[in-house]
């Protein structure tokens, strides 16, 4: 299975953080799965590090390097991902969600036929089969 990791799952996996859910850990460790990270996550961390360097421990460049060292594969943003963004649906009455990075990651997973691994409680409200909450 091709797994695209949400930014927080990516960071928790790289840091061996105790917040990484066991299900996510098992999926990442499964040798039958290919693990992907997105340039969208690199972009997100770059912005957060620039705005709050005391709260975000590394730069986007460092995150990309850690991902490569871990053997994770990159997914670069392409036009078809932006077009997929226009097709994402959200459940009626769902709580508000305004994170453009999350939406683009979902669009990438959808466009690339990947499973998107997240621990964000707001994301399962998107009616997209690619989302796997852990």
PLM features: residue spans?
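Short, well-structured N-terminal submotif of metal-dependent ribonuclease cores
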Residues: 1-37, 53-65, 121, 125-127
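Acidic active-site catalytic centers that drive phospho-/nucleotidyl reactions
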Residues: 6, 44, 102, 120
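Generic structural signal for small/hydrophobic residues in well-ordered secondary structure
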Residues: 7-8, 45, 85, 109
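Residue-level signal for well-ordered alpha-helical positions
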Residues: 16-17, 48, 88, 129-130
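General small-molecule cofactor/ligand-binding pocket signal
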Residues: 36, 75, 132
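Active-site neighborhoods of divalent-metal-dependent phosphate/nucleic-acid chemistry enzymes
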Residues: 57, 69-119
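Charged phosphate-binding loop/patch that engages nucleotide di/tri-phosphates or the phosphate backbone
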Residues: 111, 115-117, 121-134
